[in-house]
């Protein structure tokens, strides 16, 4: 059984009935789910994934003010739940967020995932949070949300990035694609540095993946799952087999084809109107679309 399915069943068959019986007043005030890092939250877990971190459990989220009055009671209830569910051991060492499962405040969850106690409020905060952290915070599923607060938090993280921040990151990855792939792969080879050329190609692939997620207005997950998630993107997912081939054997013509496809999408989104084949001038054209003068003043390579 996949982790999300197991967690949902644990909530529906063990946790929610216990709360209804013991403290039903909490149901409208809490959220329950499984979200954050891990292949299970992305739906990518399999039998091999069960060799670590596989347990029956769920997360219970309270607002900070509710945690002060109800957190201990809810944690005690959670710790009294069965030690095994559907033949899978449960994790109980989770009082007040000490562990993956159990009771957490919404602020604790945000701090664990993004480094902030709140959703990002400024462009600087959005720039500082890595894509994989935002992806993890949005991954998984909320099974119940009495107040709607966790749903709102995750929706803000999913869709709330300011457009100027997205555009700035696109510009940065565009110039880094140009530098690593269109310029340095061939240059390293002319120097006889094949290992350096392959490393440059890996950089190109990594920045291209980041670009694809940004062009789709999605957050790129941790590198281990980036390719699999990229295959599900609505736009440019057809490039993924080509990027996989580049990792096996760097090829300059293939790099140019990938770059051309990205340039075409940049034009389609109104981010550039230039006719260049090289990505670098397009990156500067993208920078000129930024309206916030502070963001526009950042170094072009900053992502």
What are these regions (language model features)?
Residues 19-65:
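Active-site nucleotide-donor binding segment shared across nucleotidyl transfer reactions
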Residues 42-44, 57-59, 87, 193, ...:
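Ligand-binding pocket scaffold of soluble enzyme catalytic domains
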Residues 133-296:
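Conserved nucleotidyltransferase catalytic core and NTase-mimicking acidic/glycine-rich helix/loop elements
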Residues 69-189:
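Conserved NTP/Mg2+-binding pocket subregion across the NTase superfamily
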Residues 62-67, 191-195:
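A generic structural motif
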Residues 1-17:
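N-terminal regions immediately upstream of nucleotidyltransferase
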């Amino acid at each position: 059984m996949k982790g999300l399915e197991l967690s949902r069943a644990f909530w529906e068959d063990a946790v929610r009935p216990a709360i209804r019986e013991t403290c039903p007043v909490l149901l409208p005030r809490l959220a329950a789910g499984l979200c954050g890092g891990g292949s299970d939250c992305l739906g990518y877990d399999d039998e091999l994934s069960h060799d670590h971190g596989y347990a029956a459990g769920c997360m219970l989220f309270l607002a900070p003010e509710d945690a002060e009055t109800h957190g201990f009671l809810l944690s005690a209830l959670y710790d009294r739940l069965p030690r095994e569910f559907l033949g899978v051991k449960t994790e109980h060492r989770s009082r007040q967020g000490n562990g993956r499962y159990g009771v957490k405040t919404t602020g604790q969850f945000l701090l664990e995932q993004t480094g902030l106690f709140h959703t990002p409020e400024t462009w600087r905060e959005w720039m500082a949070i890595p894509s994989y952290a935002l992806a993890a915070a949005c991954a998984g599923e909320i099974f119940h949300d009495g107040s709607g607060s966790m749903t709102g938090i995750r929706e803000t993280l999913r869709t709330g990035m300011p457009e100027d921040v997205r555009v700035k990151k696109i510009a940065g990855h565009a110039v880094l694609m140009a530098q690593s792939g269109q310029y340095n792969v061939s240059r390293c080879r002319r120097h006889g540095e094949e290992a350096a050329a392959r490393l440059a190609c890996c950089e190109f692939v990594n920045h291209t993946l980041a670009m694809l997620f940004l062009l789709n207005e999605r957050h790129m997950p941790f590198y281990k799952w980036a390719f699999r998630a990229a295959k599900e993107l609505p736009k440019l997912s057809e490039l993924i087999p080509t990027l996989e081939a580049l990792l096996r054997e760097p090829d300059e013509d293939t790099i140019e084809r990938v770059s051309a496809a990205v340039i075409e999408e940049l034009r389609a989104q109104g981010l550039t109107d230039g006719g260049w084949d090289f990505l670098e001038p397009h990156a500067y054209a993208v920078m000129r679309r930024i309206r916030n003068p502070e963001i526009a003043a950042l170094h072009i390579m900053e992502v």
